[in-house]
A protein has these predicted regions:
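Primarily recognizes the serine-hydrolase "nucleophile elbow" in alpha/beta-hydrolase
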Residues: 125-195, 204, 209
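Short beta-strand/loop motif that positions the catalytic acidic residue
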Residues: 222-224, 228
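Short beta-strand element of the alpha/beta-hydrolase
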Residues: 66-76
């Protein structure tokens, strides 16, 4: 069936596909700048001498006596490199909106000589640690979303869809599955025609999110540029169709003429953060009006 796109295409009650173009649109912050929130750092996992940390951004009015919804971000970098500060601004903004935002470290090839499989294991360990210690962290264990960009989006999607790749030494009775997913130009296909296949090869079915969507997959939003040379739009459209076939929500926001890793740049940072805000609000994670754009 042919799809017709306008600059912004909205379906009442549920955003299905949105195509965003900024050729004639100039977005501005409602806040003069995002409120600075200093992250607290705690170790969630140790492998021999490797320490992996969570960088936790709390609301300004944080109280240990309250319980907060949460989102956990995983940075991109092809499972090779990257830094949790990649999602610092998103984390500070969402903390200013009243939830706890966390940016998680995980093992990467250039630093730890690891493969994507270890990266997925660490992402699952991070989700499990947060849920296990939810009371201590003042987090609602049933409202923990995950998000990320590129390979970090893959890790979030893998937590939501992949069975296995868990650390057997952890308490596997505690779920590592996020309750929602916010994915920015995510790696979702590791098959022969997808990204990263040369590193994964015949094991791709163990780690490829698009090949493992099942009933009950977490509600998801995907934000991607139409000129992304690493993640074809057709791939995310197939992912969306598969999600909906399984009865799960999957919103897709396309950014006209944008390439891979566009989302931290200028007006695209503003709008992608706004779209994530709107998505999380629709699921009850956030309340009140957004403060990221007019």
């Amino acid at each position: 069936m042919a799809k017709v796109f306008k600059d912004i295409w909205l379906i009442p009650k549920l955003v299905l596909v949105t195509l965003v173009s900024f050729s004639c649109v100039h977005l501005t912050y409602c806040q003069e700048k995002i409120i600075t929130v200093e992250a607290e750092t705690i170790e969630y996992k140790r492998i021999d001498t490797i320490s992996l940390n969570l960088h936790i951004y709390k609301p300004l009015n944080f109280s240990n006596d309250s319980t907060y919804n949460c989102i956990v971000f995983f940075h991109g970098g092809g499972w090779n490199n990257g830094h949790p500060n990649a999602f610092k601004r998103q984390s500070m903004y969402l903390a200013s909106r009243g939830i706890i935002a966390i940016s998680a470290e995980y093992r990467i090839k250039n630093k730890h000589n690891t493969t994507p499989f270890e990266s997925v294991e660490d992402a699952k360990s991070a989700m499990r640690y947060i849920r296990k210690h939810a009371r201590k962290l003042s987090i609602n264990p049933n409202m923990i979303a995950a998000g990320g960009g590129s390979a970090g989006g893959h890790l979030a999607a893998a937590c939501g869809n992949i069975i296995g790749l868990e650390n057997p030494n952890e308490d596997l009775s505690i779920s590592s599955v996020p309750n929602a997913l916010a994915l920015l130009n995510p790696v979702i296909d590791n098959g022969p025609d997808g990204y990263g296949y040369q590193r994964i090869k015949e094991r791709y079915l163990e780690i490829s999110p698009i090949h493992n969507i099942t009933n009950g997959a977490p509600p998801t939003i995907i934000l991607i540029g139409t000129k992304d040379k690493l993640i074809p739009v057709s791939t995310v459209e197939t992912y969306k169709d598969n999600m909906e076939t399984m009865g799960s929500r999957c919103d897709l926001v396309l950014y006209k003429n944008q390439e891979h890793a566009f989302f931290n740049k200028g007006e695209y940072f503003i709008d992608t953060t706004y779209q994530i805000d709107r998505f999380l609000k629709s699921l009850g994670y956030l309340k009140g009006p957004n403060t990221i754009k007019k």
